């Protein structure tokens, strides 16, 4: 009856009864701490009040009362306030606005009371009291109906969650300004004036429902709460369990926000990374522009723009003493006199060459016939631009001409080689060396001229023609560098005076087609020469007539050079020469100086006495240097002794050792059983290599004794 009397109070009085006193809040906190640990199975009941909130517009008044009490129970927990402050409090009144007219004046007050409950504590009583005031006396039946409605609505809990989630978001957008701030002071005054006469049993039941609803709301709504700041609500009367849960939710929110921030940052980074990629082409263009500045500079050596027509010719041997304008005028007039119109003339910055553009291919072909005409006293060269032909391609269609007269000119060669597109005379110190490179349009033309013009007489001398490039190297290896075959046609001249020149030798060997006097880096003769003839008969004749002839105070020695790689060669060439027949007084320094181009010399000595064994080794940088030195010093003398030369056997072939030979005599460092030096290959051997007299890497089987026989004890 007391409850009914209180229910009859005015709305103003119901306001005072709405929120619970602070003492009840503290009691409820203690109860909540214990209930949070015990009640884990009541999560399904939490959604039940939400379902009733949905039915408030269609069910009878009795159910409306129940639904509002439960509706107030769902949004009021402090946990919910911590996650979504102001959002839930505003959402509930918004839904109540749909209820009958009686409820309309109350939502504002209820909203204030609910906001009060949201801010300090999950006061369940505060939520129930406004429901009683709103219905004016029907709260007596409310509590009895709670249990009935709980049983009826358990099956619909999942649907309530979905429906509430659907309705809450639109309400949240318009409700963010929390009305709790102005309403909270009034509710606090009402708490002080109001003495709650309700039974403790009602409080317990309502608080149990509230705790269950708190747990359920906490688990259902964290996703919504993460977008709203949780700092708005002052945490005064939260229990320890709620604070821990709030901390966990806050951490989850922070993690979610961090993840979102990271995703945003990643998106921004990707956009920033995409922009440089887009900008990269611009940078590359700039870089390529810089890189192309060097080639551009080369292109800019040609005065003027790019070719105006596809029909252009290269013009060379211009007079560099004239200006660009003078050259252009003279070249244009030259073609005009021959009924050819030059569309454009572009000269190089050095004014030694240029390019001329024509209107048609016919004009271009006619202009080619004018090569050799003079412009400012110089005979111009006209030819098609070479383009980007590789060196290999050009070498394949180029011939090397030897045994030319030292006074021959390019014009004289052009008369013989009419198909040549370019002729380059080789000179040294302003004087011709008697050789020239003759380039043709194609490799077939080069082969044709080699066959037809080989041995042709030019200015009283028989010319010798050779291939260049890889083709010429193959011919050298096979001994077919020309049409000649059979015996060697080259003589090796040694003991030559250092003052003798190629011209001096040319006067002696009149039939020679090519003469070469190797020189050291200082331009001084190395004391030997190669003299090539047109045939083996000519070479043999010169050998018989000129051997041991005196030239410039020294007696020369001549011998036939065996073709490289031929079976007549005594052994395989290498970078090391074996020298036998040395005097005991010959030192390594003397031995090295005796061979021009040598880099190191070693004399083999007796391990016990230290005296010379009478032989040694001389190293060179290349096989060519070694071969030239060998041919020059063949049958030569060192310190009055005539020496014998041979190639040092490569590693693993036995015979006289290579680089390790001089270290330890026959036994090398290992004594009489081999070791690293001596006869055993490249310093590994002795007669038996490391293993002794028989076998091993050095291998005694290939050793051919030269000189006296050596016995080991």
From Swiss-Prot:
Keywords (A to Z) from UniProt: Acetylation, Cytoplasm, DNA-binding, Isopeptide bond, Methylation, Nucleus, Phosphoprotein, Repeat, RNA-binding, Ubl conjugation
Residue location of crosslink Glycyl lysine isopeptide (Lys-Gly) (interchain with G-Cter in SUMO1): 301, 328, 592
RRM domain residues: 311-387, 397-470, 489-563, 575-650
Post-translational events: Some glutamate residues are glycylated by TTLL8. This modification occurs exclusively on glutamate residues and results in a glycine chain on the gamma-carboxyl group.
GO cellular component, one term: nucleolus
Pfam families named in the record: RRM_1
Modified residues (Asymmetric dimethylarginine): 659, 663, 669, 673, 676, 682, 684, 690, 694, 697
Positions of the UniProt region annotated as 8 X 8 AA tandem repeats of X-T-P-X-K-K-X-X: 58-135
GO biological process, one term: angiogenesis
Cross-link Glycyl lysine isopeptide (Lys-Gly) (interchain with G-Cter in SUMO2) per UniProt, renumbered positions: 301, 328, 374, 381, 516, 580, 592, 627
Any GO molecular function: signaling receptor binding
Positions with biased composition (Gly residues): 653-702
Sequence repeats by residue range: 58-65, 75-82, 83-90, 91-98, 99-104, 105-112, 120-127, 128-135
Residues with the Omega-N-methylarginine modification: 697
Region: Disordered, residue numbers: 1-309, 645-713
PANTHER family (alphabetical): NUCLEOLIN (PTHR23003:SF42), RNA RECOGNITION MOTIF RRM DOMAIN CONTAINING PROTEIN (PTHR23003)
Record function comment: Nucleolin is the major nucleolar protein of growing eukaryotic cells. It is found associated with intranucleolar chromatin and pre-ribosomal particles. It induces chromatin decondensation by binding to histone H1. It is thought to play a role in pre-rRNA transcription and ribosome assembly. May play a role in the process of transcriptional elongation. Binds RNA oligonucleotides with 5'-UUAGGG-3' repeats more tightly than the telomeric single-stranded DNA 5'-TTAGGG-3' repeats.
Protein name per UniProt: Nucleolin
């Amino acid at each position: 009856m007391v409850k009914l009397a209180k229910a009859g109070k005015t709305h103003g009085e119901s306001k005072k009864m709405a929120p619970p006193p602070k003492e009840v809040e503290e009691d409820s906190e203690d109860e909540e701490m214990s209930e949070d640990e015990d009640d884990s199975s009541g999560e399904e009941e939490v959604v039940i009040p939400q379902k009733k909130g949905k039915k408030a517009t269609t069910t009878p008044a009795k159910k409306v009362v129940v639904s509002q009490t439960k509706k107030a129970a769902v949004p009021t927990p402090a946990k919910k306030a911590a996650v979504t402050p102001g959002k839930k409090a505003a959402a509930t009144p918004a839904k109540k606005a749909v209820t009958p007219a009686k409820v309309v004046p109350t939502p504002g007050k209820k909203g204030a009371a609910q906001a009060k409950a949201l801010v300090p504590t999950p006061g369940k009583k505060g939520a129930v009291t406004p429901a009683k005031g709103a219905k004016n006396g029907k709260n007596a039946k409310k509590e009895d109906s709670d249990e009935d409605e709980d049983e009826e609505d358990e099956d619909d809990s999942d649907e309530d969650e979905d429906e509430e989630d659907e309705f809450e978001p639109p309400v949240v957008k318009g409700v963010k300004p929390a009305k709790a701030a102005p309403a909270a002071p009034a509710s606090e005054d009402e708490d002080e004036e109001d003495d709650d006469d309700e039974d403790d049993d009602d409080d317990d039941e309502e608080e149990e429902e509230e705790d269950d609803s708190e747990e359920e709301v906490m688990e259902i709504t964290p996703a919504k709460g993460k977008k709203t700041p949780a700092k708005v609500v002052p945490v005064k009367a939260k229990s320890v369990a709620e604070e821990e849960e709030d901390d966990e939710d806050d951490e989850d929110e922070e993690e979610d926000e961090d993840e979102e921030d990271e995703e945003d940052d990643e998106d921004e980074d990707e956009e920033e990374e995409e922009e440089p990629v887009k900008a990269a082409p611009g940078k590359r263009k700039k870089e390529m522009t810089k890189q192309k500045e060097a080639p551009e500079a080369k292109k800019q050596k040609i005065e003027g723009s790019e070719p105006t027509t596809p029909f252009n010719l290269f013009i060379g041997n211009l007079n560099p003493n004239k200006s660009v304008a003078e050259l252009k005028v003279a070249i244009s007039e030259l073609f005009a006199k021959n009924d050819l119109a030059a569309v454009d003339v572009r000269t190089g910055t050095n004014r030694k060459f240029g390019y001329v553009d024509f209107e048609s291919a016919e004009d271009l072909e006619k202009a080619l016939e004018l090569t050799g005409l003079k412009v400012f006293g110089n005979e111009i060269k006209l030819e098609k631009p070479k383009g980007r032909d590789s060196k290999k391609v050009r070498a394949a269609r180029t011939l090397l001409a030897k045994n030319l007269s030292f006074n021959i000119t390019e014009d004289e060669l052009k008369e013989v080689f009419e198909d040549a597109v370019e002729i380059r005379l080789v000179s040294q110190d302003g004087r011709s060396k008697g050789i020239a490179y003759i380039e043709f349009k194609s490799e077939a033309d080069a082969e044709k001229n080699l066959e037809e013009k080989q041995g042709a007489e030019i200015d009283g001398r028989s010319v010798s023609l050779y291939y260049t490039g890889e083709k010429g190297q193959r011919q050298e290896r096979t001994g077919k560098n020309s049409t000649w075959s059979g015996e060697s046609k080259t003589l090796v001249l040694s003991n030559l005076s250092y003052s003798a020149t190629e011209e001096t030798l040319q006067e002696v060997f009149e039939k020679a087609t090519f003469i070469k006097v190797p020189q050291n880096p200082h331009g001084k003769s190395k004391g030997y020469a190669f003299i090539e003839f047109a045939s083996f008969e000519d070479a043999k004749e010169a050998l018989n007539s000129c051997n041991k002839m005196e030239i410039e105070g020294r007696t020369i020695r001549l011998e036939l050079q065996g073709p490289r790689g031929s079976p007549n060669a005594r052994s395989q060439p290498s970078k090391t020469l074996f020298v036998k027949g040395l005097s005991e007084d010959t030192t390594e320094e003397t031995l090295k100086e005796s061979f021009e181009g040598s880099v190191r010399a070693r004399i083999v000595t007796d391990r016990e006495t230290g005296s010379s064994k009478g032989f040694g080794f001389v190293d060179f940088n290349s096989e060519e240097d070694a071969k030239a030195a060998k041919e020059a010093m063949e049958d030569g003398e060192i310190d009055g002794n005539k020496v014998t030369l041979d190639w040092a056997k490569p590693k693993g072939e036995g015979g006289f050792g290579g680089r390790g030979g001089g270290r330890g005599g026959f036994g090398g460092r290992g004594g009489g059983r081999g070791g690293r030096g001596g006869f055993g290959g490249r310093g590994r051997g002795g007669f038996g290599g490391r293993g002794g007299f028989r076998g091993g890497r050095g291998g005694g089987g290939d050793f051919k004794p030269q000189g006296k026989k050596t016995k080991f004890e």
